[in-house]
Amino acid sequence: MKPVVLFVSLVFSIIGAEPEPDPKELPRIPFTAAKDARKTFTVKEGFELQLAAAEPLVAEPVAMCFDEFGRLFVVEMIGYSERQHEKLGRVRRLVDTNGDGRFDQSTIFAKGLAWPTAVFCSNGGVFVGVTPDLFFFKDTDGDGVADTKKKVFTGFGQARLNVQGIFNSLRWGLDNRIHGATAHSGGSIMKPGTDGKPVSLRGRDFSIDPRTLELRAEGSTAQHGMSFDNFGRKYVCSNSSHLQV
């Protein structure tokens, strides 16, 4: 059996009650309780679906990445897709303290982020995509909360008009670089405080050398969702063509 990590997030925000629904709107769809979530999936023979984390440990997850210690860092896009509050997004650190395959400890690693969409663990810290910026957070005292924050790059999809079209999917490539999907918003990328020529990402994805922080453009772009197989082949997703290679 191949276990698949499952996260369950209720449709309401854990930070406060939803506004009263307009009676003229379509009726609300009831949420599915965490204990019943697996029943809603159809799983291919040979695979097994297991619940790894649910509210209140995690809410509204959109991206995740394991570090070298097996801790899971999860981007929570709180407040999507409304613009009532701009900086509700955050990153959670989940830990399985007893090794039973279920996360039982949750810490807010970073907060106050506007529409975070990507996360990648490297060099003892965490890269987080928060359009138009890519930040690097690090916990230096071991309390599970980031105490350093550095803006590594800026210029990604500055308009932020469409949350489905901003950069996402930070993945490790066989070339030992961190790859990312630029999406439809493109960008003109620079390191903050420098006068160098910006890297244009119009219609192109990107990759970063985590040691030197050199960024370069890469091929065509995905909309939201990108990964590699064991042979280095790149798979991308878009609304029109769900899976491309």
Whereabouts are the PLM-identified features?
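Bacterial N-terminal signal peptides
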Residues: K2-S13
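Beta-propeller domains with acidic blade repeats across secreted/periplasmic ectodomains
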Residues: G16-V245
